[in-house]
Design a protein with these regions (language model features):
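Cleavable N-terminal signal peptides of Sec/SRP-targeted secreted and luminal proteins
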Residues: 2-17
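Extracellular low-complexity, O-glycosylation-prone Ser/Thr/Pro/Gly-rich "stalks"
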Residues: 18-273
């Protein structure tokens, strides 16, 4: 009965979360070249320059409320369909879904309202620019949840920051500490990469799941606000992905990469938004 109810919830959540295509007036630029994730991931991790943290400015759930915010939190988000590439910092997002998908940028410690968001057509890639020194995360989602003024922390995070004091060097990782709603792959121009693309959201043991506000069942967060570990989802992430590729918690692995040219590329297989 539990499995039957879970299946019904998954179907209902998936239907509720399907986005409406923006349509011909979206003003989306032509797609950039799409990625070849198999080629990117063919580079062995022994050849990848990795860091446990490096210069990455990360969101810390146990300290966030006490931090002075480097940015003013947004009162309303900025919608883009794809930014002009003027040579500054930013990331490309390759949406591998067959349909439009939404991606939401949050400043660190600003959880209620995204700073910027973008809808990208299926099988296309767009560039999103960020200011010098930007630090935050990107999540997949839908407007009904991500733009409702409430924090939506549950899910996979692309954590990214740029160090303005050191040539605006970029740092990035994929974190599953606040949950896992699907794969993210991130890489730099040197071929260093982290993240995963395989589907890992089905078949996890009891205690590994949590429900997003839109009804989607995803892998639960691995760390609580007090820093204690939820071992069932953490161990599932280790088993299916590995701590050398993602943050499964704050104690394992070296899943951070850096870029000297202010740019990261990302590939997003379909998940549960």
């Amino acid at each position: 009965m539990v499995k039957y109810a879970l299946a019904l919830s998954l179907v209902a959540g998936a239907v509720a979360a399907l986005p409406a295509a923006p349509g011909v007036n979206s003003q989306a630029p032509p797609s950039l070249p799409n990625a070849n994730p198999a080629a990117i991931m063919s580079v062995p991790q022994s050849n990848v320059k990795s860091y446990q943290t490096g210069g990455l400015v990360r969101y810390n759930v146990t300290e966030s409320s006490g931090l002075s915010k480097r940015w003013g939190c947004s009162a309303s988000p900025t919608l883009t369909w794809g930014d002009a590439d003027n040579g500054g910092p930013g990331i490309t997002i390759d949406n591998d879904s067959n349909d439009w998908r939404g991606f939401y940028f949050y400043h660190n410690s600003c959880d209620s309202i995204p700073w910027k968001y973008i809808w990208i057509a299926g099988k296309t890639t767009q560039f999103v620019s960020v200011p010098t020194g930007w630090a935050g995360r990107v999540q997949r989602g839908v407007d009904a949840s991500m733009l409702n003024g409430q924090p939506q922390l549950l899910g996979s995070w692309l954590e990214i920051s740029w160090d303005a004091a050191n040539g605006n060097t970029g740092w990035a990782d994929v974190s599953l500490i606040r949950g896992n709603d699907g794969g993210i792959l991130v890489w730099n121009a040197n071929g260093d990469w982290k993240g995963f693309t395989q589907w890992v959201l089905d078949g996890a043991p009891e205690g590994a799941y949590d429900m997003k506000n839109d009804g989607q069942w995803v892998i639960k967060y691995t760390e609580n606000n007090d820093g204690s570990i939820n071992t069932i989802p953490r161990d599932w992430d280790i088993q299916k992905i590995g701590s050398q590729y993602v943050y499964v918690d704050d104690a394992h692995g070296s899943p951070v990469i850096s870029t000297p040219n202010q740019r990261f590329s990302t590939f997003w297989p379909d998940g549960r938004a």
